[in-house]
């Protein structure tokens, strides 16, 4: 069995690493990404920063990914929640919940570099980047994906992780919000 993941942003790259880790490389994963690893113009791994909740960091640690991200992460020790113009607020601290941090802030470009470094050595993962899906066909048993490079990939599962305007989901008439 094999899985073809189209889109190597945060969701696709993390899924590929999770499958590799949880199956110890026994399930073949093909990751197709339009941008070269470390590309400055990667839309999913740009200069934006995101906050990862403590539970997310724990899940990433469980699949062996957090260890690669921790050194570029800034811990969140306090969160202040208020609504301007309205009375009341709440302040949450990691200390009161007996946590090292409520979460961490990471820059997506750093995350992308580190995820792709891990992907290059992940058992069972084959990277196809930069490359794009030209077309695909489905049968009851499998999906065949033809890449713009001419390579053909066959798998039992096709994952559309190619962004909020997924061309793969669109071609399959998958509705989403």
Residue map of PLM features:
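Extreme N-terminal starter segment of soluble prokaryotic enzymes
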Residues: 1-3
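Conserved N-terminal helical subregion
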Residues: 72-171
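Hydrophobic/small residue at the entry helix of a nucleotide-binding pocket
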Residues: 11, 15
